[in-house]
UniProtKB/Swiss-Prot annotation:
May function as scaffolding protein. Required for normal location of RPGR at the connecting cilium of photoreceptor cells. Required for normal disk morphogenesis and disk organization in the outer segment of photoreceptor cells and for survival of photoreceptor cells. Signal peptide: none annotated. This is X-linked retinitis pigmentosa GTPase regulator-interacting protein 1. Keywords: Cell projection, Cilium, Coiled coil, Sensory transduction, Vision. Interacts with NPHP4. Interacts with NEK4. Forms homodimers and elongated homopolymers. Interacts with RPGR. Interacts with SPATA7. Interacts with CEP290/NPHP6; mediating the association between RPGR and CEP290/NPHP6. Residues 41-67, 194-220, 1022-1039, 1088-1115 have a biased composition (Basic and acidic residues). Its main location: other. Residues 745-870 form the C2 domain. Residues 77-86, 183-193, 351-367, 1129-1141 have a biased composition (Polar residues).
Amino acid sequence: MQHLLEYMPEDLPVRDTDSSPLLKGTSGKNVRAQPHLGRMNQKELNCRRLHLHEEPTLVKEPSPKQRDKNRRRRTNVQRSTTTQPDLRTLAVLQEPERRRRPWVSASPSPSAPPRAPVPGRKAHVQRLCPSTAVGSAQPRVHAGRRLPHIAGPNDRRSHTAPPAFKDYVADKNTRIEITREPSQLTHTMTTDSTHVEEIPRSPEKTSKVEKPEQRSSEECTQKAAELRASIKENVELIRLKKLLQERNTSLAATEAQLTRVQEAYEDLLQKNQGILDTAHNAFLSQVNELKAELSEESKKAVSLRTQLGDVSILQITLKEFQVRVEDLEKERKLLSDSYDRLLENMLDSSHQPLDSSHQPHWSTELTGKQLPPQVCPLLDQMGTALEETKVFRQATNKAAQDGKLKFQDTDILYQHEQEEESLQSTATVASSPEELCELAAQPTLLPQTDQRESSEPKAQDENDLSQVLSELQVSHAETTLELEKTRDMLLLQRKINMCYQEELEATLTKADRENRDHEEKLERLNHLLDFKNSRIKQLEGILRSHGLPTSEQLKDVAYGTLPPSLCLEPLAAHRGDDEVDMSLLHPSENLFELHVHQAFLTPAALTQAGDTQPTTFCTYSFYDFETHCTPLSTGPQPLYDFTSQYVVQADYLLLHYLQGTSVRLDLHQAMASEYHVLATGWISLDKVLGTVERVHGLATLAGAGGEDLGVLEYWMRLCLPLKPSLQACNKRKKAQAYLSVSVLGARKVQSNESRSETWAPQNELRVEITRCCGLRSRRLGRQPSPYVMYRFFTFPDHDTIIIPASSNPYFKDQALFPVLVTSDLDQYLRREALSVYVFDDEDPEPGSYLGRAQVPLLPLAQNKSIKGDFNLTDSGEKSNGSIKVQLDWKSHYLAPEGFQMSEAEKPEGEEKEEEGGEEEVKEEEVEEEEEEEEEEEEVKEEKEEEEEEEREEEEEKEEEKEEEEEEDEKEEEEEEEEEEEEEEEDENKDVLEASFTEEWVPFFSQDQIASTEIPIEAGQYPEKRKPPVIAEKKEREHQVASYSRRKHSKKPGVQDKNRMEYLSCNILNGNTQQMHYTEWKFSGLKKAEDGGLKAQDKREEPPSPRSALRQEHPSHPRNAFSLADQESCEQASEVSETQTTDSDDIIVTPQAQTVPKADSEKMCIEIVSLAFCPEADVMSDETIQQVYVEYKFCDLPLSETETPMSLRKPRAGEEIHFHFSKVIDLDPVEHQSRRQFLFAMLHAQDSDEGRFKFTVVSDPLDEEKKECQDIGYAYLELWQIFQSGKDILEQELEIVSPRNQAIQIGRLKVSLQAAAALHGIYKEMTEDLFS
């Protein structure tokens, strides 16, 4: 045991850095179960250290079991000593001792004395504490040979063993420890035997002591094994801690190295980034340079293209010039030939002597005989020219002579000087006799030279004269040639004048014939007018004789010049100073007053307002008037005291509005410059109908969530009773109808038509706009403020209220449209759709809308109601929510066929004779009977005034029945003229009976009405004739004037005059389309009287006192690409084959409908909008104020292919809308040239010829006397449409400058529907080519 404890630390090397794991046995398991030393706190480490310190002490104390074991061993030793010891056993027991001796102490000397015997107690203590024995103390340092269990050197370098060697080392250490344990046990046994030898004991005692010692030794061995395992674990932990420290050190070094590497990497990354930035910048600069080069090249390419186009044009012009040059050369050749001939003639005539005036003899002959009198001025000019040339010739001759004389003088002087020099030279030199003779002979030579020199000027003068004469002859020949040309021109002009004279004579004869026809027509019309006036006077005499109103009185009532005597209720006596004078009101007008007095707000309202003294005001709108606003008021009980006065037209629309509509009143809170709706209330208007006094009431103010926020005190009233006003309105309408019937009764057919349309059945259509859902604003991030607008039939536009900031607005808007059931209405219901537009009030862009819904009206023509949600689509044909619409009739709808007479049933007009005395007697008898009936009906009418509305409906039914009876009577008596006249008289009597007995009683006293009937004939004219041509022309001119007023609304300019002239020609030629519009003025009678016998077939509503006379027209909602609408509007005539529409102008509807054409036989072009670039030169040009767009197409005139009106030049970022569409007929039979034109564009080799060209033109103002100029071109490729097979819908085209087509100045948005037509034309033409 002593050796076990002492040698245990020596089993492990002092510096073992091997990182091998623990043994794979129980020790390994124990090590893994123990916590790491680094994770244990200080307290646990101290406890464990004390426990390890006490364990050796406990181990040293022998347990009873160990003591028993020791006793048994001693007993065995004693027995072996008593007997003869076994040598082998002794060797075995001494072998460990021998092996331990070198480690226990140094080799003892052979002369060492033997140890002294130790006492028993000392031996016992030595046995219990073997580590204290001196002789057995073990050194701590290796002092001799290696231990037997160590296989290799003790000292090893760290980190020398590979990782795979760790398990092997652990297994080896385990084997060494296992082999060491038997040696230690052997050593213990030998030690015990020595003790036994020292203290011999008895066998009994020995046997008693052996058992406990043996047990104690076993226990000690077990504890020692456990202790050894724990020590190993601790040592292993210490080793691991050292290893951890080393690893931490290496990790720190690695981290330092890593930081250095990171720094180096960052430096390298920065360098690379800098290099990359430099390369990137260089690359971008290169890209920019390449872009600049590309733009330059593109500009060059565009310029080259334009040059190429110009070159093509120049080539064409060059060819033309070449042809002209050839013609000029031929003409020059002819002129040269004629000139040569004339020159020869002149030269031949020059040999003949000239007269005193130096003129050739043939000139006088030409003047006197050949040339006409018109050439005399030219001959005079020629004579003056000849005189001038003669004077000029004399002057030139004189100058030439002077020059020649000067030249001769100079020659003579020069010769004289030479002679003097020669004489001087001869004087100085000695002269010989020969020279003197020569000098003497020289004077004789001088006269000869003078004679030669004098003869030379004469010859030269003759040559000059002949040259001048030839020049004069040439000029004279040229003058003669010009005179011949002038003669030819005069002859041609004479022929032209003769042609003009013949045309003038034909025109004059035609005009005379037309004048005679016109005079004849005027005579007929005057005859008819006189006959009508005589009949009117006769009937008025009958009316006066019976005390009934005449036509003048009817006119007074119809046009309001004679106010009816209304039985008004007495007004209140406490009227204020600000009251309106009732005498200023029209008879059919009334005054409605709405007074907002005071509001009482609840604490909840003040809490919601966030102020105890809020500043509030109220807004409300009544009928079709603008919104009114009260003044500001502060406090929880604001006092407004504000009265709104409305002058309204008393009709059934107002009655229905007051009966079923409530006025919405909004209470706003004002905060600085902003305000918001605090509460909303509704004011019911039906209580005001029963009285003319003030109707006081309280309106509950509710918040957005329905909570009660207070009440509002108000009062309202109608200043005049509504029932008499309605009666006056009805009487006025019927008076106008009677006047129109009496005036338009010139012909029987027109009378029947006017009567049937006047008494056409009435109905009322109710249109309700309930709500919209899912609306999206065109501006991102904002909610729209929507309102709805639509137009039904010929009525004006109707719009709803504006709902601020709502994507799901709730309108509940109802509109009533009283209509006459006519064929036009039925046709409109069966073929058209109601376009409902939703606009955003906060959208600044004009012409834009949130959505559009198409509501088909066909169910209404079938007496069915329409109700449902309809999808809304924006201008880009994208869905933008839905709208709920409801349309239904007030009463049963019947088609107009049941109320109109068929063509076969209508009697033919025949000539009528003047009335005889017998007919007048019959008429008087019938009148007396009818007057008695009128008296009875007047009595009944006085009793039934309160139930007037119901009775009117019954009367209308009775009138319809009477008309049917009258028609039956007419059918039976068509052949007899007298009976036919009597029937017409009966009809007119019935008409007046229904009118006078029911309507005129309140206007005239009872004593003025006699008990007789009044016969009124619808018309008594000789025969059925066509409408007069003059009346038609006047009506058409009226249409032209009204169209131009609506279309242009300004003084027509140059282009406007051209458009009006073209339109007027079409209208006057009878090729126009009927323009349906309703004028809000009573011009039916005047139209009928001025136009001759024109039917007034519609009832017209009185004008509103708030507005001037207006003209309303049915502008069906624009749908540029609705093929069904376009097909239904096509015409067969040449002028009406195309149709132009404009969103701001009237829509022309056709008179006659034709079979819709296929898509391959027509094309539609629409010019939608226009916008200019802000940097374009057009924007800065002040001379350009208005623009329009035009294009050229084959044989169509520009008046049809240009926008109907010019618009203001758009500002920067603004877009103007034309919405000008045109359907072009491409019929293969009638318009083959147009199809060939399109085929040529598709096959054009030149890019310019294959493009559709739009031209933007500036339109000067009226006061500017300037011409229109082209400011831009836009091109559309037809080949793209042909290849894609798709129509173009609102495509933006670039507008280029005319001077430089590489510069873009704006955008033009157009649409073209021609894909099917282009495919059909291409297929047809190619088949014709290859067939």
